[in-house]
């Protein structure tokens, strides 16, 4: 799997203190994911909660199949998770 994003729309480093490349680290561990069905985006968007180093992040992405069969995970947005999202991720990934 490879990652991509629109560099012109990525204001994350300046506005949020991290870039999309940093945000891809959440996929190295367990993520809590749900489909974003709030409206029709013309594509299947997924909201993923996870951790990159010591930071809880929420990343919105869509998967696109490449001609080679490889998956291109296109990052749409990334931000620090809010309290509710951090608690949901912790609950979902904690051992009983």
Label the predicted regions.
Residues 1-96:
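Ribonuclease/tRNase effector modules and their secretory precursors
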């Amino acid at each position: 799997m490879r990652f991509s994003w629109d560099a012109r729309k990525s204001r994350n480093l300046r506005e949020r203190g991290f870039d999309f490349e940093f945000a891809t680290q959440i996929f190295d561990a367990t993520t809590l994911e749900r489909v974003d069905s709030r409206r029709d985006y013309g594509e299947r968007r997924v909201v993923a909660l996870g951790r990159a180093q010591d930071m809880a992040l929420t990343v919105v992405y869509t998967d696109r199949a490449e001609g080679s069969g490889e998956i291109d995970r296109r990052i749409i947005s990334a931000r620090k998770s809010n309290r509710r999202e951090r608690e949901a991720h912790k609950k979902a990934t904690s051992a009983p």
